[in-house]
Amino acid sequence: MAWHQALGFGAENYRFHDHEKLAHYANAATDIEFHMPFGFKEVEGIHSRTNFDLSQHEKYSGKQIKYFDPQTNESYTPYVIETSIGVDRMFLSIMCHAFCEEQLENGETRTVLRLPAALAPVKLAVLPLVKKDGLPEKAREIVDQLKFHFTCQYDEKDSIGKRYRRQDAIGTPYCVTVDHDTLQDGCVTLRFRDTMEQERVSIADLNAIIEEKVSITSLLKKL
């Protein structure tokens, strides 16, 4: 359950569902279910297969498969706990939760794919404010610096607002805007997908800031 909840979809969207009917070798079984738009559906199955599997190996191989407990001075055949997470079910649960259409204060509808940053295919988009005055060149320079660390996109077509919307729709968690001040102070505007909040950061700090937010390590630390 810890892995599922680390994705940030809310503990209230998960539940355990215990099996009433069990396989002949099992003494317990439960499913982890996620609240899809069409109801709670299984994303992971967990089964206690008791010592059936290893006992069968012992029986037909003629070899003992036992664990000796030094504290109790007893030997026993270990139980096997089987867990199964379907990639397709996991993908569906992520997409169901991530897709959002929200109304903005100006009346427009914003389509957002709120993918966990660690799982987003594109981590960062670098956008020159305009297609002149050396801004595209500076933006591409930043892409060249960061592309070895994570997947980046460069986009200079249409207004900055439309470019933000495109990145929101494909789930890019962060956008960097290069403006005229960038050429003077070496700083860029970092925009956050989910909140649309922006902050000014140094180009020199970009790699460390983004890496901390989008690395799989940051997700695993939540477990």
Residue ranges and their predicted role:
Residues M1-L223:
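NTP/phosphate- and nucleic-acid-binding module
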